[in-house]
């Protein structure tokens, strides 16, 4: 299962979803989908922009967890 760790990364920085939306220019609804892991697909440009703004690597934002 692919996981998006946006909620953890924002929490570590004490940022809101609105903060990230403003700083990236990504629609708040899209940020919310990523935050709540509702996105069935991700836009790689969005992931790149989020990593740039958060100062993180893609591997810190997205990971694969094996179902047990």
Language-model features and meaning:
Residues 11, 25, 36, 66:
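Residue-level detection of the helix-turn-helix DNA-binding "recognition helix"
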Residues 45-60:
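DNA major-groove recognition helix of helix-turn-helix/homeodomain DNA-binding modules
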Residues 1-15:
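A short, Lys/Arg-rich alpha-helix, primarily the initiator
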Residues 10, 21, 51:
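The alpha-helix within a helix-turn-helix
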Residues 8, 33, 52, 62-68:
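Short, charged recognition helix plus adjacent turn
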Residues 7, 18, 48:
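Residues within the helices of the helix-turn-helix
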Residues 26-41:
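Recognition helix of helix-turn-helix/homeodomain-like DNA-binding domains
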């Amino acid at each position: 299962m692919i996981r998006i760790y946006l909620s953890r990364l924002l929490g570590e920085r004490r940022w809101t979803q609105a903060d990230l939306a403003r700083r990236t220019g990504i629609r708040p609804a899209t940020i919310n989908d990523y935050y709540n892991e509702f996105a069935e697909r991700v836009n790689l440009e969005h992931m790149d922009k989020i990593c740039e703004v958060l100062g993180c690597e893609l591997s810190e934002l997205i990971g694969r967890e094996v179902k047990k």
